[in-house]
Amino acid sequence: MKIIDMQTAKNVIQVSIDKAREMNINPIMVVVLDHRGAIKACLGEEGISPFRFKIAYGKANGAYQMGMGSRALFNRAEQQAYFVNAINTLADGNLIPVPGGVLIRDENNAIIGSVGISGDSSDNDEIAAVAGIESIGLK
């Protein structure tokens, strides 16, 4: 299994931020979780609200812990609000079911981490996260 090491996490963050600048969106906070679901690296651009860390972490954590991207969690929340609310309670509020949390999968489709981004619209956050993940040759 491939591991998300510190340099890989930093690369994901930089490419995600570069994508955000290319798109000319609001400043973003990026959180990368490793194969254990632990924070490997995080970085917020200048001008980002400190609260954005919690949102980005909640997106990454929810995706990782539930084994589905936060867009899928968003769809599930629309259909099973009580279930997602209960899971969020179990996660001590660290599950944000809106797009912007993306799983990192290796070449065997195993989950090896996740990326969470907050700062702009959820769709734009997700685009930046995907760019970061794709930059390291993963999906």
Task: Label every PLM stretch briefly.
Residues 1-139:
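Flexible, solvent-exposed loop/hinge segments and secondary-structure transition points
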